[in-house]
C-alpha cells in the first residue's frame, strides 16, 4: 500500500507541474507507424526475455514441460503488476515456479540470476552510452568509463561467488541460525552457475540485446512524438530510466520512473509534456505486454488449476 500510495503521490505531483490534458493529446497524436514499431519492439523484447528464461529452466534441470515453463514466465510477469515494480514479477515468478516444481531454493536462485544479469547488462549499457554521447575524444572519460565497466563486471562476478564470500566473512556463530542456512543454500544454488560459463555468456548477450531493444523502443516513441534526440543520448540516459522503473518504490513503474525520464530529457530541451507522454506510453506498453499472462492466469483459475 505504501508503494501504491507513493505512485499516486508522484503522479499527483507530476500532474501539478505538467499539463496532463496536453500530455494526453501529445500521446494520442503519436505517429501510428512509430507506435506500431514500438509495439513490435515490445514483442521482440518479450520473446528474448522468454528465451532467456527457457535457457535457465533447461540448465536447472527442472522437470517442467516447455508449455508449463512458458506459463510460469507469462503468469509471473502478469502477477508482478500488482507488486512492487522490479522485484514484483521476480517474486511472483519464483513463487509460481516453486509451487510447480517443489524446488523453492533453486527457483529463487534462478530468478535471482536472471535479474542480476539484466541489471549488469543495464549498467554496462549505460557506461557505453555515456562514452558515445560525450564523444570519444575525451581520453580521461574513456579511462574512467573503462574503469567503471571493469568495476561493474567485478561486482557482478562477485555475486556468483556469494557462497564463498559468506563462508569467509560471516561469523561461525551465525551458522546455526535458520536465516543463515537459507541464505547459504541460496548462495550455493546461485554459485552452481559458475560451472556453466557458456550459459552465462549466452544469457548476458541476450540481456544486452534486450536492453538495447528497450532503449530503441523509447527512441522510437520519442521520434513518433516529434522530438528528435540522438540515439546515443538514449543509450546514456534510458538505462537510468529503466532502472528507475524497476526499482521497488512504485507499482508498475508509474510515477517514479516517469518522473526520472522527464528529468533526464530536460537537459536536451525536450518539453515536459512530450517527455511525460513518452514515458507514460513506455510504462503502459510494459504493463500491456503482460496481457497474455493475464489470459493464461484467468483461464487456469476458471479450470481450477494453480
Kindly give the residue locations of the regions a language model identified.
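Select subsegments of transmembrane alpha-helices in polytopic membrane proteins
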Residues: 1-2, 113-122, 209
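Predominantly cytoplasmic-facing regulatory/coupling regions of multi-pass membrane proteins
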Residues: 1-74, 132, 136-246, 274-306
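Juxtamembrane transmembrane-helix termini in multi-pass membrane transport proteins
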Residues: 54-57, 98, 107-108
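Membrane-interface alpha-helices at helix entry/exit sites of multi-pass transporters
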Residues: 67-71, 85-90, 100-116, 270-281
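Transmembrane alpha-helix interface/packing and boundary motifs in multi-pass membrane proteins
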Residues: 76-85, 237-258
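Mid-bilayer segments of alpha-helical transmembrane spans in multi-pass integral membrane proteins
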Residues: 77-87, 115-127
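Hydrophobic alpha-helical membrane segments of integral membrane proteins
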Residues: 82, 92-96, 108-112, 121, ...
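Re-entrant/interfacial helical elements at transmembrane boundaries that shape
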Residues: 89-98, 251-267
